[in-house]
């Protein structure tokens, strides 16, 4: 028996947002999408999806699409660490904008499988944060900023092959890259021009 008009109009059944429906369909193709600022909530979702896909098949590739202005360092590094932790190759594909932590995650994909679409913009800069409070508080926060900066420089150097000193100089202020410039710098391995270049789950 087909549903009645009243059943269509029921409000006691929560409707799944269209974005969530799309995300679930992408997940079935082993595609994870980061399309916003990185915070704890989105990081926990992406970490969970990476772990789930790895548990389902420890050999097939996972593809992470990135369109993000950056965000929380701790949240972003949770994603980063899981990308390195799971045995699967993680393809990264930059679309639109990969800035700050988005840039870090883009270059952290498996070597040879890091991509960007032609008009993607990539931005690198040093970590920043507000400092205030007592002298002791300021000293503690300053030490943490120095630690994060050193970690970022070392990680970016590892993934790009650029010397730490060069990255430190380039990241002193916002440094913008086109997709081609990002390729030359070592953030990515290829600029994609059509969809057959990268697929969802094949290794």
Curated annotation (Swiss-Prot):
Protein name per UniProt: ATP-dependent Clp protease proteolytic subunit 2
GO molecular function, one term: serine-type endopeptidase activity
Keyword Nuclease recorded: no
Subunit structure, interactors included: Fourteen ClpP subunits assemble into 2 heptameric rings which stack back to back to give a disk-like structure with a central cavity, resembling the structure of eukaryotic proteasomes.
A single GO BP: protein quality control for misfolded or incompletely synthesized proteins
Enzyme category, top tier: hydrolase
Record organism: Thermobifida fusca (strain YX)
Keyword Protease: yes
Coiled-coil positions: none
Matches recorded under PANTHER family: ATP-DEPENDENT CLP PROTEASE PROTEOLYTIC SUBUNIT
